[in-house]
Amino acid sequence: LRMTLKKFGLWLGVVGFVAMLSLPAPEGLSDTGWRVAAVTVLIGCWWFTEAVPVTLTGSLPFLTLPLLGIAKPDAIASLYMSPVLFLILGGSLIGLAFEKWNLHRRVALMVVSKANPEPRSLLLAIMAVTAFVSMWVNNSATTVMMLPIAMAALAAVVPEEGTKVDASLQRHHRNFAAAMILAVSLASNLGGFATPIGTPVNSIAVGILERSYEVRLSFIEWMSFGVPFMLLSVPVAWWILSRVTLPFDFAGASRESIRDSIGEPGPIGVAERRVLAIVAIVAAAWVFLPVLEKTIPGLTDAGIAVAGALAL
């Protein structure tokens, strides 16, 4: 089925591309705009179906746009070397360092193991730590990492399947389980909005603003509205989940049972300390960039990200 979908996407993209180039541009759209639309259809079909490797699809604009007379090769190449891409690259490498040494898991275990074991408080703790980790690590990776921790905490609070409980309590347990899973997904997205590197979409938005409207948003300027949004939206999402969408109300487990269920993070190693130190320096440099620029002209968010990645 997957191979069939890939072949379908491959030929759908090619046929759509050729057909659009063979037809005149619709009224109100320039010939150049119509050719750009044809390239977009080709790339979209190949991207969504993964008809060819994603890296190859991403390189198509460099080939097709100059051939169709839409833009010159040097103009296209300059976009592939955009500072925003280096911000994404540096931020991604920092996130990978977190993942390699399980620092995100360590933070999560420390917070959740010390959280109030009452179900609603536990749900809020899971959401808070997920949102924090997602500020620095890719949303998908954060979700994959946090779900097992959330499920382990859930297992300590909710009795095993088959345990005899009354129907009302069973409904509360079921709602809590569903809320816990949804909470991780929601918090990952909300936390990802807090920083420019929280999700690639943020960095792309920064690049578009700078290139198209000459509006430059620094790391700290993005955080000035991204962090307050996260701090407001996470509690609101928690309240809606636990009180409206999937209400639950029952006694929780002891803090010891939750700690036993999710496990202990263990002693911190030398490599983890080094990664934490580098990340702390990078984060501080992003925050104090306006001050650092006076001493180090030309320093940018992307430069800081790359320097941090090289140090790792």
PLM feature segments, named:
Residues 29-33, 51, 98, 116-120, ...:
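Alpha-helix capping and helix-loop boundary segments enriched in small/acidic/polar residues
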Residues 25, 42, 55-171:
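Membrane-embedded alpha-helical segments and adjacent helix-loop junctions characteristic
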Residues 1-87, 211-213, 221-312:
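Hydrophobic transmembrane alpha-helices of multi-pass small-molecule transporters
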Residues 44-53, 129-138, 185-196:
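Transmembrane alpha-helix interface/packing and boundary motifs in multi-pass membrane proteins
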Residues 161-247:
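Membrane-core helix-loop-helix motifs of multi-pass transport proteins
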Residues 102, 107, 157-164, 202-209, ...:
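Peri-membrane helix termini and adjoining interfacial loops of integral membrane proteins
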Residues 61-62, 140-155, 181-182, 194-211, ...:
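Re-entrant/interfacial helical elements at transmembrane boundaries that shape
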